[in-house]
Regions:
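DNA-recognition helix of helix-turn-helix
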Residues: 343-369
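Amphipathic alpha-helical segment used for protein-protein interaction
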Residues: 300-325
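Walker A/P-loop phosphate-binding motif and the immediately C-terminal alpha-helix
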Residues: 4-41
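A short pre-motif secondary-structure segment
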Residues: 327-331
Length: 370
């Protein structure tokens, strides 16, 4: 039987990995074979799960193996931990990503899933795969489980602050969008972590039509457990909450939500009255520091420069030969392919390329020398 796949999304720093880790541990205590998949470039999802030991990431291992022209194997990137008192080992993977400022995190997620799918991840003898996903960025890579229906179910994690709820709302909207174009991921509901009793996240959930699955109160002892790379479910009051949620998931007691998310104005009005007035525009005078009565000649001059460049280019094009003009306009302005231009003008593709090349060289000369 294929593994049950659940993507857990939330704003960075709100306890998303804490939630995922303790849910993984709870499933393992229920004799389920669990794989926790860290899908954040920070690659810290499984740190507590593995007692503080960092896992080599798929991104790094793939780069090293690729440099040596060697294939990536399961044992290179999948790790297990046997824990006393747990009937099943817990498995972990960190996708990782590029170093800060050196690449695209979303692209790293896409590439990581490509590697895992080639290794047959969805055919492994695993009961549940929990995917711990960053939800802060509007990036197609981080929406991979939703876009490709790699996760059957989605759980949102939030606190009672506006920014974390806003992130949850964005993910809800994204999941709804992908469902409208054939996506199969179902939204199970919302977990409120570090609940302060203010009820803000609950008001949002009610307005958006999202089920509140669990409320985890702020607990200093739970924080200390996590900070020392241990499980908060060792605390009875925390364990009880996670056990109930895990049991509800396993026994299919949760009805998926049909929520589409709130639009922006509907969202912000949850936090207070907001005026319908349009924002007040700034003026060029105040930004350029002009005194009242000065002309706006800088703005006009800047626009004139842009206009004159376009006009100059058009004049240069008109100086090309008729054949060069025809090919250049079709390729550069009408965005036709070389093969299409060749067919329309009854020329060989090589002839079209030569005309295009000569036209570009001539335009460069005319524009900068004219």
């Amino acid at each position: 039987m294929a593994a049950r796949t659940i993507a857990i999304y939330g704003k960075g720093g709100i306890g998303k990995s804490f939630t995922t880790t303790n849910l993984s541990a709870t499933f393992a205590l229920m004799n389920k074979r669990v794989l926790q998949l860290g899908c954040d470039p920070k690659h810290d999802s499984t740190t507590s799960l593995f007692g503080g030991i960092p896992l080599p990431t798929v991104t790094d291992v793939f780069a090293e193996k690729n440099a040596l022209n060697q294939p990536v194997s399961i044992s290179d990137i999948v790790f297990r931990r046997d824990i006393a008192g747990f009937p099943q080992p817990i498995y972990g993977i960190e996708l990782g990503g590029p170093q800060v400022g050196r690449g695209c995190g979303g692209r790293g997620i896409i590439s990581g899933f490509d590697v895992l799918e080639k290794l047959g991840i969805f055919n492994w003898d695993i009961d549940i795969i929990l995917m711990d996903f960053l939800g802060d960025v509007v990036c197609g890579g981080f929406a991979t489980p939703l876009a490709r229906s790699l996760s059957e179910e989605v759980i949102l994690v939030t606190n009672n602050d506006r920014q974390s709820i806003f992130t949850a709302n964005n993910i809800c909207q994204a999941n709804n969008y992908f469902r409208t174009i054939g996506g199969q991921s179902r939204l199970l509901g919302l977990i409120i972590n570090r609940d302060d009793g203010s009820g803000v996240a609950e008001r949002y959930a009610e307005a958006a039509g999202i089920t509140v699955l669990m409320k985890v109160p702020y607990d200093a002892d739970a924080r200390d457990k996590d900070d020392s790379f241990d499980f908060a479910i060792r605390l009875p009051e925390i364990r009880e909450k996670f056990q109930k949620l895990a049991q509800d998931i396993v026994e299919d007691r949760i009805t998926p939500c049909e929520a589409v998310g709130l639009d922006f104005m509907g969202f912000v009005r949850l936090f207070g009255e907001v005026s319908d007035d349009a924002p007040q525009p700034a003026t060029a005078d105040e930004l350029f520091g002009r005194k009242q009565g000065d002309s706006g000649s800088e703005t006009i001059a800047q626009k004139s420069t842009l206009d004159s460049d376009d006009q100059k280019m058009n004049r240069c094009i008109e100086k090309l030969t008729a054949e060069q003009q025809e090919v250049y306009r079709m390729v550069e302005q009408e965005k036709k392919a070389i093969s299409e231009v060749a067919e329309l003008t009854h020329r060989e593709k090589s002839a079209v390329r030569e005309l295009l090349s000569s036209a570009r060289k001539e335009l460069t000369r005319l524009f900068f020398e004219g």
